[in-house]
């Protein structure tokens, strides 16, 4: 039976997943027994369409590319237009909500309300929005469990690189006592350019903005706020240790000068913005701050916009994972992985 999907938000990431589902349709069916049907899309700017029998995804993508609006999706019997996000979640025949709306990370809204509306209806949610997971992890986890719904958010930390799923599956049985990571590609790109090309912070930031790595207002990245939300998610989900955003000390890279970079190079070291969470005396101490790393540190070799994370395990020792931390297809893939997890659980139940 095909999974019926409703997209809340349909920007770059949502369209990335839609392209994957279209292009890998037969491979997913053959290799995973996975079939999906997009029945609804509700986007604040692009419009809203719903058909219980499914939408033609190639037509959707073509219409958006040519006109930018779902209002130009062709009419057909049974097509419904204009439903808002909450009604789309509650009243469509979707069993899984793809939550990729534009959300205020400081409040987690409207994505938190979207999750609650879905869980109340017993519908699964997969998402890439950090805010709800960092700000309402316990509440939403309990709500999903109470209503028998799956809540997937792999893409909130390192895009499609499995920073959450890998430790849960492959490191099970270990006590993970510390997590250290380069969780923001923008800041790592800036520091790498300063180190390799000898340019100033300002010049490296400008280049990052021109390449699309950094926003016009780069504060979320360069002040460490983005990484702070991610380390909170890692602490709660991977270390099973409650941690709030306000408990994380946060210092960005704006104070790092070219002189600091050159001095570190002379010492055989490298500056990186490190997100850290460590268990101490029964609680977790977490911080975001620039650190001067020895060459032997596995995080010191991570350059450009790549992300990486190191898990300190009581049985296995140090394990480091690196990979893409952003990108249309990469983040779309993170949603696919959560959908495949739902599919595998469904297959186990059916057996």
Label each residue range with its predicted role.
Residues 1-120:
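N-terminal glycine-/serine-/threonine-rich beta1-alpha1-beta2 phosphate-ribose binding loop
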Residues 2, 297-351:
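ATP-dependent carboxylate/acyl-activation modules
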Residues 8, 12, 16, 36, ...:
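Conserved active-site and cofactor/substrate-binding residues in soluble primary-metabolism enzymes
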Residues 102-121, 130-158, 162-167:
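Rossmann-fold NAD(P)-binding glycine/threonine-rich loop
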Residues 168-229, 234:
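Conserved anion/nucleotide-ligand pocket segment
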Residues 205-301, 308:
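Substrate-binding/catalytic subdomain of NAD(P)-dependent oxidoreductase enzymes
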């Amino acid at each position: 039976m095909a999974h019926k999907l409703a997209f809340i938000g349909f920007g770059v990431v949502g369209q990335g997943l839609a392209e994957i589902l279209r292009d890998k349709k037969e491979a997913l069916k053959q290799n995973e027994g996975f079939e999906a049907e997009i029945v609804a899309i509700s986007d604040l700017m692009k419009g809203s369409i719903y058909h219980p029998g499914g939408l033609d995804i190639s037509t959707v993508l073509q219409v958006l590319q040519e006109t930018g609006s779902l209002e130009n999706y062709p009419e057909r019997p049974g097509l419904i237009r204009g439903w808002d996000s909450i009604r789309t979640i509650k009243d469509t025949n979707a069993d899984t909500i793809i939550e990729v709306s534009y959300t205020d990370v400081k409040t987690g809204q409207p994505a938190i309300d979207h999750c609650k509306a879905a869980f109340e209806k017993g519908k699964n949610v997969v998402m890439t929005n950090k805010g709800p997971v960092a700000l309402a992890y316990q509440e939403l986890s309990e709500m999903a469990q109470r209503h028998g719904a799956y809540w997937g958010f792999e893409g909130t930390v390192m895009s499609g690189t499995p920073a959450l799923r890998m430790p849960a599956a492959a490191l099970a049985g270990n006590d993970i006592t510390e997590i250290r990571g380069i969780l923001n590609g923008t800041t790592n790109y800036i520091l790498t350019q300063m180190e390799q090309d000898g340019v100033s912070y300002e010049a490296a930031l400008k280049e990052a903005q021109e390449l699309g790595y950094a926003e016009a207002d780069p504060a979320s990245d360069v002040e460490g706020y983005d990484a702070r939300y991610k380390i909170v998610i890692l602490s709660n989900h991977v270390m099973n240790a409650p941690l709030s955003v306000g408990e994380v000390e946060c210092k960005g890279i704006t104070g790092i000068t070219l002189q600091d970079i050159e001095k570190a190079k002379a010492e055989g070291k490298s500056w990186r913005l490190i997100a850290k969470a460590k268990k101490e005396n029964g609680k977790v101490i977490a911080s975001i701050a620039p650190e001067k790393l020895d060459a032997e540190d596995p995080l010191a070799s991570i350059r450009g916009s790549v992300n990486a994370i190191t898990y300190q395990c009581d049985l296995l020792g140090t394990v480091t994972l690196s990979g893409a931390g952003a990108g249309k297809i990469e983040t779309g893939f993170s949603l696919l992985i959560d959908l495949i997890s739902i599919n595998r659980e469904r297959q186990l139940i059916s057996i």
